[in-house]
Each structure stands twice: as structure tokens, then as C-alpha cells.
A protein has these predicted regions:
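Ala/Thr-enriched low-complexity intrinsically disordered regions
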Residues: 5-8, 32, 232, 308
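N-terminal secretory signal peptides that target proteins for export/translocation
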Residues: 1-27
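Compositionally biased, low-complexity segments
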Residues: 18, 30, 306-307
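Bacterial N-terminal signal peptides
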Residues: 30-42
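Short intrinsically disordered, low-complexity segments
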Residues: 9-12, 36-38, 309-312
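Eukaryotic helix-grip
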Residues: 47-312
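Intrinsic disorder/low-complexity segments in short proteins, especially the signal peptide
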Residues: 8, 20-24, 41-42, 301, ...
Length: 312
């Protein structure tokens, strides 16, 4: 089945679309304060998303979706875990595997940087329905993913496709970056025991003075450049007494100033891996706690939404 055949598939939804300092010390100080793209640069380090950066991002996402298409072909590995036998064994022992999709996990594009990582784990003693139900509890993300996600709302759903919003923050040393965004999620059933899906951002904005009377959302494509776009591909397969879950997480950010790659790139890689391991650990715990949440509506109109989603 061609993923792009569906009228609401991301193929039809995603639109195509220096840091320069005269003194080396100023450039180093500006980017050091932003702590390697993660801390969020100050106003003097503001970045703006350029058309050529967005075009490169869209091309990259098209390639990622083509790779997903190939995984659906007969004789191909649906799961990244199955490409090497040791991977499945390791996750069954409880490990959460994180690896760059290509090379270092970073691809330089004009005036930007694409980060592409895959994370995989085994959720024991559960079913694909329970995992799928849990990942669809968008209103509960503020509870699942504390302290990173501080607000989460389900905006709409028709079962297979949902819209939701998140406000999340990242703290490092003395700087906090707050991002507010809207997202769409679209899932398909591959078989009775396997599914896959896509989540992509439709709006991401930097938030200044979060929670204060002077709070301000900067226009999309401006601000810190910490995150401009997000896209993910997830795969689920039930077997061996549990569910294998993997996620390819792709992000677009501002680029690294010339001469600072040696300082920035290793830290960005470590933070990327750490964030994905934490995310999957929290997801696994949310699946485990599903029986305790059964019948509760504390996260919004969960019951009707999840019945519709799991029936697709």
C-alpha cells in the first residue's frame, strides 16, 4: 500500500516550503549561552527560518516517508529492530536502544540542521491495543511526560487522525526554553498485530515570559531556532509476549555557527539520546499504569476518543 494514497496522509498535508559576529569571542559567547542549541539563544542570537532551509527539510521528510514505504514491501523488515538480531534481544532484556538514522544523526542544510534519531524498546506483558490507546491519550501527555510537557490538549480526532497541542520546556543550567505547538497524528493498521503512524508539527512558536502577564508567542519561524519543525514515524508490533515499539524522531533547528561544531555536536548528540530514552521510559510507564486509569476522564474526553481510535 502506498502511504501517499490516503487523502489525509502527511504527503498531502506537509507544505513545501549567519549567525555572524565580527569577533570570534562574541560568536562563541552567544552560542555557549544557548548551550548548543538546547538552551535557547538570547535575542542577540535570534534566528529566522529561511525558504531554502524549509525546502531542504521538506525534501528530507519525503525521503523518510519513502523509506517507510519500503518497509511495507513483502520481504522487507517492518521494524528497524529486526535488521540485526542482537537488537531485539537487547530490548527484550529491558534496554532502550537509541541510534542515529544516518552517520552522526545530523544533516547540515542551508542555514539549518536536521536531527534524525531512532529509538526502540520492548513493552512486556501488554498488547498493541493498550500501547496504541496510551499513545493516543494526548490530553494526558502533561502527566505522562513531566516535567518536559507542561500543557497538553486534544483538539480533534476522527479515530485514525488527531490534532493536539503541547507546551513543553527544556531547562539546562540557567536558561529555560519554552515552546508551544500544534501537531497532527495519523495512524494506519498494517495487520492485526502491527501498526504505524506519523506525527508532525503544524505550528511551533517560542514563548517568552511563560505564564506571566507579559507572555508573548513569537511568530513561527523566528526566535531561538531551537526547534522549527518536528516529524516522527512510529511502528508497533505485538509478539513475544509484548509489543515492540520504535520511533524515528526528526527535527529541524538552526545551524551551528562555523568553528563551533567540535563543541556543539557531541553535546547535542548526548542530549538527543538522553531525551529519547527518557521519553520511551515514560511511555512504557504510562502503558503499565493504563489499568489504573481505566474509566477515568481526568485527561478530557478520553473514553470516547480512545474507543474510536483503537477500533480503526
Amino acid at each position: 500500500m502506498d502511504l501517499r494514497a490516503h487523502p489525509t496522509h502527511p504527503d498531502r498535508r506537509i507544505q513545501l516550503g549567519r549567525l555572524q559576529r565580527s569577533e570570534h569571542g562574541q560568536r562563541r559567547h552567544c552560542f555557549a549561552i544557548s548551550l548548543l542549541l538546547i538552551l535557547g539563544p538570547g535575542l542577540s542570537c535570534a534566528a529566522e527560518l529561511q525558504p531554502e532551509t524549509l525546502a531542504a527539510w521538506n525534501h528530507y521528510i519525503e525521503q523518510a516517508k519513502m523509506r517507510m514505504n519500503l518497509r511495507l514491501d513483502a520481504g522487507s523488515h517492518f521494524l528497524w529492530l529486526d535488521e540485526e538480531s542482537d537488537r531485539a534481544r537487547r530490548v527484550r532484556r529491558g534496554e532502550i536502544l537509541v541510534a542515529p538514522v544516518n552517520g552522526s544523526g545530523r544533516t547540515e542544510v542551508p542555514n539549518g540542521l536536521i536531527h534524525d534519531w531512532i529509538v526502540a524498546a520492548f513493552f512486556p506483558d501488554t498488547t498493541i491495543e493498550k500501547v496504541f490507546v496510551t499513545t493516543g491519550e494526548y490530553a494526558c501527555y502533561k502527566d505522562f511526560y513531566k516535567p518536559t510537557v507542561v500543557e497538553s490538549k486534544l483538539l480533534s480526532t476522527d479515530g485514525s487522525e488527531s490534532s493536539f497541542s503541547l507546551r513543553w520546556l527544556k531547562k539546562a543550567l540557567f536558561v529555560t526554553t519554552v515552546m508551544d505547538g500544534d501537531y497532527k497524528a495519523y495512524y494506519l493498521r498494517r495487520s492485526e498485530k502491527s501498526r504505524y503512524g506519523f506525527v508532525w508539527s503544524t505550528r511551533i512558536q517560542d514563548v517568552v515570559n511563560d505564564g506571566q502577564s507579559s507572555e508573548l508567542k513569537l511568530p513561527p519561524g523566528t526566535g531561538s531556532g531551537f526547534i522549527w519543525r518536528l516529524f516522527s514515524i512510529s511502528r508497533f508490533e505485538e509478539r513475544d509476549g509484548g509489543v515492540y515499539v520504535e520511533l524515528e524522531a526528526i527535527a529541524l533547528s538552526r545551524g551551528v555557527p562555523p568553528g563551533l561544531g567540535w563543541l556543539v555536536n557531541p553535546v547535542v548528540s548526548r542530549l538527543s539520546q538522553s531525551s529519547l530514552v527518557t521519553f520511551f521510559s515514560q511511555t512504557r510507564e504510562a502503558v503499565r499504569s493504563l489499568p489504573q486509569r481505566a474509566g477515568l476522564d481526568s485527561c478530557g474526553s478520553r473514553s470516547s476518543v480512545l474507543r474510536a481510535r483503537s477500533s480503526k
